[in-house]
């Protein structure tokens, strides 16, 4: 606050190591606990949104298990979000989950809570679709937006991560 900079959101840094989709309930609880700390931190930083990667689909965690486990955990987090007046914003990343805007809408809508929103990342989504289409469909479910560039051409020729190595307006974000 002394610098005049305003934080838009806080990121729960433990969502990759302690995913809410993990097969072990103890690990999921650690993920819940980390989210509670992040929500308390965001309030202290003067923002009202925390970024959350809700889960990871892989060989050990099926899509439906990721959906069900992460849903259960987020339902446990909603009362804390309500109490603190902060939003849990689900981000689209390369976690093999919520691969279409319709799935993302259904996921957010199931909570029936104004404290669960979507953290839309224009660059991340270019692997799965077109940002403008997702934005139109997600509509008022979007709580925050990450704006960054991504080049499909660079990703195709040099590896997926290389897609981020371009300046704004030089990639495929419309």
What are these regions (language model features)?
Residues 1-72, 87, 124:
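Structural motif corresponding to the early beta-alpha repeats
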Residues 10, 72-172:
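Acidic/histidine-rich catalytic cores of soluble enzymes
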Residues 25-26, 171-173:
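Short capping/connector residues at structural and topological boundaries
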């Amino acid at each position: 606050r002394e610098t005049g900079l305003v934080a838009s959101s806080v990121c729960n840094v433990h969502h990759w190591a302690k995913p809410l989709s993990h097969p072990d309930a103890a690990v999921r609880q650690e993920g819940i606990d980390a989210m509670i700390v992040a929500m308390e931190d965001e309030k202290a930083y003067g923002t009202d949104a925390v970024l959350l990667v809700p889960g990871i689909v892989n060989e050990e965690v099926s899509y439906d298990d990721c959906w069900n486990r992460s849903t259960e955990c987020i339902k446990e987090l909603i009362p804390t979000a309500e109490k603190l007046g902060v939003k849990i914003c689900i981000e689209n990343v390369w976690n093999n989950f919520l691969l279409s805007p319709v799935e993302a809408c259904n996921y957010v809508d199931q909570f029936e809570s104004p404290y669960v929103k979507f953290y839309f990342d224009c660059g991340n989504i270019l692997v799965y679709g077109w940002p403008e289409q997702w934005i139109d469909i997600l509509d008022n479910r979007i709580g925050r937006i990450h704006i960054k560039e991504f080049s499909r051409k660079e990703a195709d020729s040099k590896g997926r991560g290389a897609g981020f190595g371009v300046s704004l307006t030089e990639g495929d974000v419309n």
